[in-house]
Structures are given as structure tokens and as C-alpha cells.
């Protein structure tokens, strides 16, 4: 039988993903180019095989102008899944950004792409498809520069029995709830799309950090840099609105498309959607389709409470003309279960006004009917001007309240709070204000005609980035005025309990889903009227507030969840402060299918022991991250820039000298390439509070190497240093081939700290590892005594001062008297801009060999710093490795040392000295030279000691 592959002519491979290759093919009969995605099934896990088949079946059902065209798919010989899609001549968005050479896209073009992507995402979500891997490299461009969304390898159709909690995707685009291992829904795609638009606007990822801990911290704080000033405030506010930490407050795709700023683009590109349709695996009837969507969206305990649209294939619900209304007999203590009874009963009777009043638009999507478009059955509204004023007042009130990621149903409260800097949602019946980035005076009425347009240009207006449609679901509220609002403490405890409960439970079923919507619906009208009542009471204390009498108590008592804002949980990796430089990023090019969690509960992705703080300031609170990343070492790619770094010291107490000898931890740094690397730190000497058995590098703080000055004047009381056995120094030597390159990385040397005063000689050799400030700058060496922490601001000043000192001194001059001896509170550390490739592996191995041959021998180092009690600091010698004179002297000393060792038959030490040399050796010549000088210095000390001891014996 002829294979389908015979219809295509293979041209070239144009890409490679996590599971297969993308090949450009030419259809022989059609004479048209396509892309063949070939996924190999052999040697794949069952999950990967299932994912491949899922992608094949899913993309075959998806048809949309802004989603890659599907041609055909089949399984080739039982070994490969072949998927043929349309070819996008423009490449992907990531490539286009690289080719632009830093020239930003025009805002018109960016908004065009933004709108097209939103339409594609809206289409997917309306058909229950979660993409889960939205990123710039999966956004393709046609020759006409139109967008095509592709790569559905991680996409998932949400069903009633799905947990939707698998940790998949690309780290830089993962939403906070996914990183926190909270079940997530469609709002996770909104977050990822916001990251994409941010990156397309700023040419840099929205979130990047040294490692996973730093990335999680930034994502949890929604800490993004400023967007280029060439873009309008409306666009910036739209992007920021998509990156709200709490998924409940993120707008969905339909809401963003309703924003006035995007309307010209929506009108231009939406008409092409008339032919878009989807062929479900089985027909979705109205009741089951709505039930399936409701239950599947509940897989995120705090998402999609307002995204209740169904496709045009479904039977549309119409608000009945009869006068059936949902009444509340005891609104003071209405629970979700009580709401459920009303919702189910009304749904069975065909009356869905308690859930949502909807109408079909021209494209088959049911959309919420705004308050001014409701039938007469619904409760009367306030006049338009009053509603607009109340909306502004609601904004002002909502700004005072913050909601953490897991607090799903936090309501605005009148309790005074210090959370003034946190953006909070406003349940306001106006969708046009999603993207305003200013602050409006609460007491100033705004004309309704200017509210949507002028507020975007008002310098002081506040951004209500998330607005839900008005849902007056309970026409007549019957409040119980005899109820008393619970105290803030009781409410806080109730909310904490609910938050913990939500973290542990599985996604609820349909009753829970619909009850949340009804619960939310019942609250909106009361919220607005309550705000107006409060403001009226402030302006006219003597006038009783009718709105407050009618609606305040029912709103407060509608849920056991607190209306007091929960203190923001600040999750920062260390109490001493974490430096997460924006120039260092986790790779954004790898889809982390292997990052997916195992099903058993014994491998938690992250366990936050959080300490809540009363205000929202991002201070460094003690939080413990416990990681257990299964099967991550081969999948996760971590990149390191060589231009900046954060530092932390790991200290070893020295009870003999009182000097804290600081062990240097070399963290591996790599040029931004495609070589996957996982940072590992198994040293128990780190200061972070992590479990010692984790295999992942556990913190965003880098350690740095502490160097010593090479003093030409030996100290009067040098420190005796013992040699430790070789098993106490762990080194990684798996990068021998890459170290010799120009931008090769420092090999990490994990040294264990010990409470006793035994310190390995390796420390001193490591401290000689020199960093170059520039290509023509001399080596910077320093001694640190009792260093506590490193302050980057002071550090840079110290480096500049030292550079100025060195510029004034040549290598031939006498040693300068200026040296930097760190007091306990001083900070000094060279900033490595172009690090020398240093290999601690050879040095460590060589000294370990020495220690094995003479473990009990005590040696004094000629370049050990003086003791802290010595009033005169050691003299620093300016060393320039590139100086031919010094290099010649060092090489001469190396030859003399080798000859002496050979003459004394000390072959083991001779082998150690010569070990770094050779074609296949990773240690550079400079390191070997210093190694030789160090050994020679120690030998001279040994000879002097032996001579002095021999002369003393002769005298006796």
C-alpha cells in the first residue's frame, strides 16, 4: 500500500521541537509547500505518545483564520505521528524580533497581531481548548505578515474529569497558579499571551531570572520592567492587565477584544471569522456543552468565573419573558449550596437569568447582555450618570484592597489597610476601562460620554484592568438587616481556611461552578449600590442611605469568605535579599513536558511555607522553598549571562585565627546558547533554607569567589592551614571541552564547610582565580575577612576605586600600600565582566593528591593575609598576568620547581605541577603558573622551617 509520505517531497528541516522535527515538504500533486511535523513514538513515554495522538486529533478539529492550517495527519508505520500543516513563509515571531535589530514594531502592527492572537485564543477557549504553550516561537507569520498560532503539542481539551494541573509549558510564560501547583484554567493562556505581547513590544521576556526560584519570585510578584515609551498607555495597560497575578482578575479574550482601544482592529479582522468552525469529537448539545465547560473551567479554583461563552453550534439560552425570579429567603446566610438549588432549578426550567443574561452576536458567540440592554424582567438599574459615578467610587475603594493568588473570592472591604500599591479588580459594569493606567479622583463625577475615552488620557486615572459584565442575577434582594457583619479577624481566619482548603481539593463539579457564578452575580449590583451609599453617607452623614439599607447586609453576608483583604504573601527566597538580575534568564525555548508533575503527592513541585505580612510592601520575608523536580535534568535549560551576577557568601568559622575564611563557590556561567544545563548545588554549606537532598540549584543568589592579595611581604603570623582529604571537595568536570572557548564558564566547585578550624589549601588556590575587569585591565585580587553580605551599590564603588588605583600603578612599580581589608560590615567584590576560564578541577585534584601523600603535614602559605589583630594591613602587589616579565619569571620558577622536584625524586608532586599542561587539559596557563608559584612558595617555607628546626637542634 502506498504511504501518504510518497505524496510529499522532503525539502529541508526548518525546526525541531521537544518531541520531533518540523520538515518543509512539497506536495507533488498540489505543488504547494507544507510543514510536516514528524513525532517519533518509539522510545517515548506513554504520556508523550498520548500527547502526540492528542495533538493530531485536536488540530484536525481546529479551523480558524489565525491558527495554522491543517492539511492531514496519520501514523506512519506505527512509529511516527505525521501532521501536515500550512507553511508560514514569514517564520516565527521570535526570529522576526531577532532580525529587527532592536527596532521596535510600530504600534499599529503590534495591535494587529495582538487582535489576531486574541481572536484565535477566544476561538480556542470558546471550544474548550487550552493551548498551554503560548510563546513567541509558536506564533508564526505568513508572507502578508498575518499571525498564525501553532504547535498544539501541549494543548488540552478541558473535560469534566480533568484536573488541569499538569506543570507543562515554557517557564518564562508560566502563570503564577501553574508554578504554584494550583489547578488552572483558560486564564493561564491569557497570562502567556500577555507575556508574548510584552516580549513583542519590549524585545525581552516579561519574566526572567537566574533560576527557577528567582523566576517564581518574579512571577508571583508580577514584577515586569517598563515597556518602551513609544507605545500608548492604553496598550501598556492592556498588557499589564493580562499579567495580573490572580487569575480571577485577568480579563478573558472576549473582554479584551471589547476594549475601545482595540475596536478598530477587531472590526477589521473579525469578519474573516465567519468561516471559522470546529468539528467536535462528538456533538455538544446545549445542556451538556454548558455543563462540560462549567465543570472543566472549575479545574482552576479561581479562574473563569466570567468566561461563560459557548459556540454557535450550541442552542442559545434566551431569558424567558415570564416573571420567574430567583428569590433569596435568607440572604444573610446564603451558602453556595443554597445558590446551587436555585441555579439548578432555574436551569431545568429554562430560566438562566440567575447565571447570566446573554445574547448571540454576529459570530455565534454568546456574550453578556450589558445592563442597559437587559429585558424588563431584570431589576431596574440606577441612572447612567449615577452608575458611572459609582464606578469611579468603586475604583477608589477597590484600590485599597489586594488579593493574593489563592484568595479566589476576596471582596473589597471598608477595613483600613496599607495596601495602596496593589492593583485590585473592580467589578464594574463597564468593559471599556480595562486598560487605563491612571488614577481618578473619587469625588469628581465623570460624564458618561467621556468615561471610556477620556479616562485613558487622564494623567491621574487608575487602571481598572479587569471588568466583568453586569449580571443583575437576583432582581430583588431581601436583606436581613438584623445580621451583624463578622469581625475582620474572624473573616480573615475564614478566608485563610478557605484558601488552604482550595489548595488541597480537586476541581469542583458543575454545582460548584454555577454556584460561584450565581454567587458572584448576586453580589455585583449590591457592590455598586453599597459604594454609592457609603460615599453618600460620607458627604451627608445625617441622611440615611437607602442603598445601604437595602443591599449592604446582603452583600456582606452572602458568603462566609472574608471581605477583609488577605495580607499579601510575599515569597522571597532569602531573608537577606535576593538579587535576580534581569539580564539573566531561564531559557524560553524549551517546552517542559518533562517538568510535568508525577501523580503521586510525594513529589511536590513547590511547598511554600509563607509568612503573611500586614502590608503589601515587597519586603524580604522568610519563606522556605522546598523543591523536588522529577526528571528535570535533561529537559530544563538554564542560561546565564556573563555581564552581571548576584553574590552571596558562604562562611566558614575559624576558631584558631578568628578570621572567617570564605569558601568560594564558582557557579557555572554559560554564554547564551542552546546547550541545556542544569545548575546543581548539593553543598550543605549554603545559607538558604532548602532541603539538602534537592538536585536543583535552589536559589537565585549566586555565590562568588573571594580572592586574596598576593602579598610580597610575608605576615608575621601566617595562618597554618591543614590539607583536607580529597573526598571533602566535590568538583564538576563535565565541561572540559567548553572551558577553553572565549566565553567559557567557570566550573563550579562545591566545598563543604566544617565547624572545626581545618581549611583546605584548595581555598587559597581558588582565591587566586582571577577575574578580568576588562580585556586590558589587570587582574583584581582581594582579601575578605569576616565578610557578611555584598551590597551591589557599594561593590561597584569599591571596584571603581580599585580600578583607579591600578591605573595609577604599573607592574614595575613598587607594591601599592592601598589594600582592601573588609571590616565586618564592608562589602567588596570584583564584578566579573569577562571572566578567565578557570578550572578548579585540576587544582582541587592536585591538592587532594598532595593531601593524600602527606595528610598530616602543616604548611604555611606565603601569601596568606595577616591576622585580623595585626594593625598593619598586608601590602598588595599589582599583578598583571599579561605582563611578559611576570610570565617569564613565573615560567622560569615553574621550570626550577620542576627540576628541584625531579632532583629530590618527588615525582608525585612533579606530576601535580605538570598536570595542568597539555593539549587536552582544561586549565589555562595562567592558573598553572600561579599553581606553580604557590607550590614553590610552600616548598620554600618548608625548607626554611626545616633549616630553622635543624639549626635549633644543632645548637642544642
Curated annotation (Swiss-Prot):
Listed SUPFAM superfamilies? Protein kinase-like (PK-like)
Segments passing through the bilayer: none
Disulphide bridges in this chain?
Answer: none
Could you say which protein family the record assigns here?
Belongs to the protein kinase superfamily. NEK Ser/Thr protein kinase family. NIMA subfamily.
Please give the subunit comment from the record. Answer: Interacts with ARK1, ARK2 and ARK3 (via C-terminus).
Protein function: Involved in epidermal-cell morphogenesis in hypocotyls and roots. May act on the microtubule function. May have a secondary role in trichome branching.
Protein name listed in UniProt? Serine/threonine-protein kinase Nek5
Which source organism? Arabidopsis thaliana
In the UniProt record, what gene is named as encoding this protein?
NEK5
